């Protein structure tokens, strides 16, 4: 009944098993991937034909985590998995990026890849298994695909590269890098690092690519024994006559449009050129009694012609679209303290790309609690990236963040994390929001620069400045050009785009997307060296605006955090019965108070005086009464044989009638009344914490001469 095929291979410290032919047999391709106890099911369905009139490739990738994989039931009323988490969205993008360039040009059949996480070992992240599964499922499906693709995670621990480190190992690693590629080329890199050099980063990419050959070989074996017959597909023949006519009418117009340096003016000229070419082609067709050519087909030809023009100009050493050479960064302007009531803000403008970044400080209570499949954790640093349609002069949908926005936000966050102060040095939680107000390339890297400046403006003691830059690469044959600080148009027309962020000491985040298979290690080396040059220039501009070590003052509107350590046994005294004491404290002082199990008390208050008052009262509540010390006490209650006196909040003692005065006291009420302030000395305390107090001992110690005379 089943034609099950299984392949097992060693991959670093783990054993990987690929299975096909038993589960999801009606899909075009389905592979079950197991790495130790982490199991994912990857399925591919490809439609047999493209939709008529469709002019784009409809590929969708959905990575879905099931809570049963971790032996849990989902929360909420419906007890079902809800909308995709940030982790699911980011992993879907991670899978999509290396496989998309491997489908042939002109293949427009809809392809849907769905990966379900069926079982998870908390030590093994399912993302690498999911990438391997997607590649294997595409390969066994027999559809046109220039794979298979391998994937690897690389760590860097004690100066050594580690293949597919576990979660525990990653906690000690200076690098978390995911690389994907074919047998002959790297296609995608996504990484976070602790200020590592270009050489170490490139070494990790090469190491990962060498190791993933084991994955590619195993997929080849799986296809040989369990793959479906290859689908016979060939691209539609190119309409050479139409290509020639479009070039005849459009080339001069496009070259003229690309002489315009301003983005909006250039876009307008290109739209006008497109319209004119379509009108001229329609008129030409009408003159011979033929139908006008399809505008979508003409649009695709014009796009290819644009790419050819821009690429050839750059490779021949001519100025780029906006007049720069290949190494120049666009003009940068920086302004901090832009918004009056926010905790920190910065406006970072680079050419026609602009980010307004806002920093907000909070307490531990504001940390994001994430109920992840691999275990719950809290995150004290959040970065949210928003790009509204007006940033590109367009209209569009406004609402929940799209995959691109989530991906860009995570990249910017990765870049900044390494330079944040340690929690013990700065106990605030931090939220950064990057509002992209203009966009013409590299908005995620503008978010890194603006984010660093906004954090400094908010008073966050950053270890150093962090800057990011987006790079491009164009290659034809043996000729190639690396472009510094790419524009949006150059991003679309290039063969590789990569983003590098870091400090003066090293790289903190690297993201690469490569569309062709001829990018060598040497080319990447040149590109990374040029990126460092650009990054150092931007760091210099940031240094001029906000010199290193000059952290801004905390905003008047930001909470002040006061941290004190108390004896854990005294926590109950601060909280009180049913929380009565701490509730009264927070209401009366207007502060927010958090207490850890270890006795660390964090007081948050916008009003510094209120914070100090809360601190004083907590210290009173938790202070221990010292025998032999004199206290200012309050008479709480009169008794026949003395009085109950409170020496501290919650600390009462007995003032015996014999200890009130040196002479004989017949009636306590003759000397004391309730509410009266008295000076008392603590004579002793018993094992139950009960205090014995004396007024006459206090008088004798503080006024020895009158006391002696009285005697």
Swiss-Prot record:
Gene Ontology terms: cellular component: cytosol
Enzymatic class: transferase
Matching InterPro entries: ExoRNase_PH_dom1 (IPR001247), ExoRNase_PH_dom2 (IPR015847), ExoRNase_PH_dom2_sf (IPR036345), KH_dom (IPR004087), KH_dom_type_1 (IPR004088), KH_dom_type_1_sf (IPR036612), NA-bd_OB-fold (IPR012340), PNPase (IPR012162)
Enzyme nomenclature, EC number: 2.7.7.8
Any one GO MF annotation of this record: RNA binding
Positions of Mg(2+) binding: 491, 497
Protein family: Belongs to the polyribonucleotide nucleotidyltransferase family.
Stored HAMAP family: PNPase
Functional summary from the UniProt entry: Involved in mRNA degradation. Catalyzes the phosphorolysis of single-stranded polyribonucleotides processively in the 3'- to 5'-direction.
Protein known as: Polyribonucleotide nucleotidyltransferase
Species this protein is from: Janthinobacterium sp. (strain Marseille) (Minibacterium massiliensis)
Taxon lineage: Bacteria, Pseudomonadati, Pseudomonadota, Betaproteobacteria, Burkholderiales
């Amino acid at each position: 009944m089943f034609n099950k095929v299984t392949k097992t291979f060693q991959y670093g410290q783990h054993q990987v098993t690929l299975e096909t032919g038993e589960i999801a047999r009606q899909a075009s391709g389905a592979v079950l991937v197991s790495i130790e106890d982490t199991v994912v099911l990857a399925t591919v369905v490809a439609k047999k034909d493209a939709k008529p009139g469709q002019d784009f490739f409809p590929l969708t990738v959905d990575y879905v985590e099931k809570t049963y994989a971790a032996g849990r039931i989902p929360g909420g009323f419906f007890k079902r998995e809800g909308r995709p988490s940030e982790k699911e969205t980011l992993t879907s993008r991670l899978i999509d990026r290396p496989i998309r360039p491997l489908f042939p040009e002109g293949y427009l059949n809809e392809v849907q890849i769905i990966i379900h996480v069926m079982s998870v070992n908390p030590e093994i992240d399912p993302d690498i298994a999911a990438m391997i599964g997607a590649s294997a499922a595409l390969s066994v499906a027999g559809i046109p695909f220039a794979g298979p693709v391998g994937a690897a995670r690389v760590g860097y621990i004690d100066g050594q590269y580690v293949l597919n480190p576990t979660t525990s190992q990653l906690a000690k690693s200076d690098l978390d890098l995911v690389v994907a590629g074919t047998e002959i080329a790297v296609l995608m890199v996504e990484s976070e690092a602790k200020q590592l050099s270009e050489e170490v980063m490139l070494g990790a990419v090469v190491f990962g690519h060498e190791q993933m050959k084991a994955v590619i070989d195993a997929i080849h074996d799986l296809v040989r024994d369990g793959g479906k017959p290859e689908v016979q597909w060939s691209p539609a023949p190119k309409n050479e006559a139409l290509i020639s006519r479009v070039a005849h009418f459009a080339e001069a117009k496009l070259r003229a449009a690309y002489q315009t340096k301003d983005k909006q003016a250039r876009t307008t000229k290109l739209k006008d050129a497109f319209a004119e070419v379509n009108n001229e082609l329609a008129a030409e067709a009408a003159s011979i009694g033929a139908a006008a050519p399809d505008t979508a087909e003409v649009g695709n030809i014009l796009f290819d012609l644009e790419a050819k023009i821009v690429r050839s100009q750059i490779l021949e050493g001519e100025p780029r679209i906006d007049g720069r050479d290949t190494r120049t960064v666009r003009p940068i302007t920086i302004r901090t303290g832009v918004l009056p009531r926010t905790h920190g803000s910065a406006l970072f403008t680079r050419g026609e790309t602009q980010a307004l970044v806002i920093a907000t400080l909070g307490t531990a209570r504001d940390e994001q609690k994430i109920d992840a499949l691999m275990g719950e954790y809290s995150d004290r640093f959040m970065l949210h990236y928003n790009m509204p349609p007006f940033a590109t002069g367009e209209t569009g949908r406004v609402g929940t963040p799209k995959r691109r926005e989530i991906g860009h936000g995570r990249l910017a966050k990765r870049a900044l994390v390494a330079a944040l102060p340690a929690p013990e040095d700065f106990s605030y939680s931090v939220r950064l929001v990057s509002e992209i107000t203009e966009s013409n390339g590299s908005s995620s890297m503008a978010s890194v620069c603006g984010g660093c400046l906004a954090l400094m403006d908010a008073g966050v003691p950053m270890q150093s400045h962090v800057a990011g830059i987006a790079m491009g690469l164009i290659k034809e044959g043996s000729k190639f050009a690396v472009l510094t600080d790419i524009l949006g148009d150059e991003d679309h027309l290039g063969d590789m785009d990569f983003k590098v962020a870091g400090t003066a000491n090293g790289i903190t985040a690297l993201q690469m997307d490569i569309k062709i298979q001829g990018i060598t290690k040497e080319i990447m080396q040149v590109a990374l060296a040029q990126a460092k040059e650009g990054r150092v220039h931007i760091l210099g501009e940031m240094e001029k605006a906000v010199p290193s070590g000059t952290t801004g003052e905390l905003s008047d509107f930001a909470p002040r955090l006061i941290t004190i350590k108390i004896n854990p046994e005294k926590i109950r005294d601060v909280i009180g019965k049913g929380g009565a004491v701490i509730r009264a404290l927070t209401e009366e002082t207007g502060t927010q108070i958090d207490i850890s199990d270890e006795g660390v008390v964090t007081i948050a208050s916008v009003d510094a005086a209120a914070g100090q008052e809360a601190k004083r009262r907590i210290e009173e509540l938790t202070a221990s009464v010292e025998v032999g010390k004199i206290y200012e006490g309050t008479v709480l209650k009169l008794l026949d044989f003395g009085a109950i006196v409170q020496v501290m909040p919650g600390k009462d003692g007995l003032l015996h009638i014999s200890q009130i005065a040196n002479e004989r006291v017949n009636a306590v009420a003759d000397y004391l009344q309730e509410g009266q302030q008295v000076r008392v000395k603590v004579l002793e305390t018993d094992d139950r914490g009960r205090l014995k107090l004396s007024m006459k001992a206090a008088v004798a110690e503080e006024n020895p001469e009158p006391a002696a005379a009285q005697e």
